[in-house]
């Protein structure tokens, strides 16, 4: 009975060790360690959510990056526009020729705006609006909440519209329309104002892009930390398990031999009586 009990215990330990070696885990279910299992499963869930949020922020960053590049292009074109209007302030300048250049620049601005979308998301051509994206999760006690980042989209279309209202060949000093300059000096002021707006738009989107990148880096660090924590709780020490497996295999062989010898003992005694 002792030999059989020993063999059964060795076989059970051997099976458990083989499971740990094959899975790489020392805690595979709540049966192994309820507290560690519950904590590790929660941490795994958070890690998975962080990875999904990171993927979402990647798409957001790409949209913002595209919008920023568009804003920088519009800013460069608006700068060139203002320079041409400044040139027109001189005497003897053919305003019609300068206006043709300005019209071309306005068209280029429109093209840049139309191409500044990513995956259908437009952050540059509508009225400025607040955009909110999920940036992470927060756990306090038993409370779960999502954290967010908000930023402003920009309106480059208004810049294009304002610049298109400048017509150096049709200045009207008697005009009462505040959206249309009526002198060369006013035209330059209009152009400079829109250049400033374009620079502000590019700067705002650049700051937002940097913020998103920082949050993505932070999420990477959090995910690595959570994964390391889970590993420390549930992963098996493979060197120890391999040594234990080898020792248990030897014990199994010895226990099997002991049981075999125990089973043969009654037969040996009976053979003595036969003699």
Question: Positions of the model-derived regions?
Answer:
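Amphipathic alpha-helical coiled-coil/heptad-repeat segments
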Residues: 1-2, 8-12, 22, 26-236, ...
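Short loop/turn microsegments at loop-to-beta-strand junctions
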Residues: 119, 245-246
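Extended, low-aromatic, Leu/Ala- and acidic/polar-enriched alpha-helical coiled-coil segments
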Residues: 242, 248-249, 253-256
